[in-house]
Amino acid sequence: MTTAGRYHLTLVADGREMLHGWWASEAVARGKFTAWVGRHGDRPGARITLTDDETGTPLTTWPDSA
């Protein structure tokens, strides 16, 4: 986990990691997740994932199915 926060958001498009962000608040991270889907969801091959870095558990992904 980074000092920036426990909740890690990633955007992968066409198999390349494009963006990362970390937040201490799950509520804030989920808001960012929704914003990223709206802003970047139309990129070819986009996959957005929110992970709890403390447990290693993916909390949500977009799109829902790979």
Question: What do these predicted regions represent?
Answer:
Residues 1-19:
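Short aromatic-glycine-(Arg/Gly/Cys) micro-motifs in beta-strand/loop hairpins
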Residues 38-66:
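Short, mixed-charge low-complexity intrinsically disordered segments
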Residues 1, 16, 26-29, 33, ...:
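Short linear sequence motifs
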Residues 23-45:
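A short, charged, amphipathic alpha-helix used as a generic interaction element across diverse proteins
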Residues 4-8, 33, 48-50:
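A generic structural signal for ordered secondary structure
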Residues 15-21, 56-61:
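Surface-exposed loop/edge segments in extracytoplasmic proteins
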